[in-house]
C-alpha cells in the first residue's frame, strides 16, 4: 500500500474497493498507531474518491449505450 497523495489511475475498481475494505478493518480494529491510522485514512479517502469516479464513469457509459440502443429511452436523474 502506498500512502501517496495521488492514486494510480490504472487501479481497478475491485482492487481499490478491496484495499479500502482492508483499511477500514484495520482502523476499526485499532491495529495501527495513530500516525499510521491517519495515513491509512488519507489513503482511504483517495480510494473512496477513485471508486466513486469509476462508478460514475460506468453509469454514464451505460446511459450512453442505452441511448444509442433506443433513442426513445428517457433517463431519470440519479444521485452520484
UniProtKB/Swiss-Prot annotation:
Q: Which Pfam families match?
A: Exonuc_VII_S
Protein's recorded name: Exodeoxyribonuclease 7 small subunit
GO MF annotations for this entry?
exodeoxyribonuclease VII activity
Say what the protein does: Bidirectionally degrades single-stranded DNA into large acid-insoluble oligonucleotides, which are then degraded further into small acid-soluble oligonucleotides.
What this protein catalyses is: Exonucleolytic cleavage in either 5'- to 3'- or 3'- to 5'-direction to yield nucleoside 5'-phosphates
Where, subcellularly, is it found?
A: Cytoplasm
Q: Which residues cross the membrane?
A: none
Upper lineage: Bacteria, Pseudomonadati, Pseudomonadota, Alphaproteobacteria, Rickettsiales
User: EC number(s) for this protein?
Assistant: 3.1.11.6
SUBUNIT field: Heterooligomer composed of large and small subunits.
Show the NCBIfam families listed in the entry.
PRK00977.1-4, xseB
**Per the record, what is one GO cellular component?**
exodeoxyribonuclease VII complex
The family classification in the record reads: Belongs to the XseB family.
Q: Which keywords has UniProt assigned to this entry? A: Cytoplasm, Exonuclease, Hydrolase, Nuclease
Biological-process GO terms, alphabetical: DNA catabolic process
Indicate the enzyme's highest-level EC class. hydrolase
Its source organism is Rickettsia akari (strain Hartford)
Amino acid at each position: 500500500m502506498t500512502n501517496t497523495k495521488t492514486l494510480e489511475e490504472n487501479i481497478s475498481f475491485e482492487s481499490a474497493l478491496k484495499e479500502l475494505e482492508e483499511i477500514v478493518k484495520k482502523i476499526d480494529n485499532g491495529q495501527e498507531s495513530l500516525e499510521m491510522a491517519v495515513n491509512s485514512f488519507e489513503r482511504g479517502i483517495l480510494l473512496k474518491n477513485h471508486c466513486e469516479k469509476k462508478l460514475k464513469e460506468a453509469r454514464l457509459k451505460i446511459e450512453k449505450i442505452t441511448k444509442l440502443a433506443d433513442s426513445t429511452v428517457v433517463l431519470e436523474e440519479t444521485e452520484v
